[in-house]
Amino acid sequence: MLPAANIGDLFLIGTGGFIGASLRYTISSRMPKIRSIPAGTLTVNFLGSIVLSLLTFSSEPESVVYLVNIGILGSFTTFSTFAYETFKLLEDGQNVSFFLNIFLNVILCLLGVGIAYFALRL
């Protein structure tokens, strides 16, 4: 677990967040859907998973974690964290937790979207 962030760490996170959100918008807005699949979202989630995993598995310094993992990738995609944590469960031999994590994330996120969708239609 990372220690509590100071103002410099928060600046790195905020700067990274600006970069990640800008990249996500740029990529997602320029890619067409492929057979109804939002290719932009799929692309940023896939790339984010790769980059987050590469940085996490390589034990980068805290400043890189704040800027890239939390800042850039946190706003670029949250799926990268989900993918990494789910893979880690499998790697650690926690097979039931691996499948349960996938199930709960997918179902709860879809449920949340459904709740918001129907709440806005009332």
From Swiss-Prot:
GO terms for cellular component: plasma membrane. InterPro entries: FluC (IPR003691). The gene is fluC1. It catalyses: fluoride(in) = fluoride(out). Coiled coil: none annotated. Fluoride-specific ion channel. Important for reducing fluoride concentration in the cell, thus reducing its toxicity. Belongs to the fluoride channel Fluc/FEX (TC 1.A.43) family. Pfam families: CRCB (PF02537). It is a multi-pass membrane protein. One of its GO terms (biological process) is cellular detoxification of fluoride. Keywords: Cell membrane, Ion channel, Ion transport, Membrane, Metal-binding, Sodium, Transmembrane, Transmembrane helix, Transport. Na(+) is not transported, but it plays an essential structural role and its presence is essential for fluoride channel function. The chain crosses the membrane at residues 1-21, 37-57, 64-84, 98-118. It comes from Methanosarcina mazei (strain ATCC BAA-159 / DSM 3647 / Goe1 / Go1 / JCM 11833 / OCM 88) (Methanosarcina frisia). This is Fluoride-specific ion channel FluC 1. Disulfide bonds: none annotated.
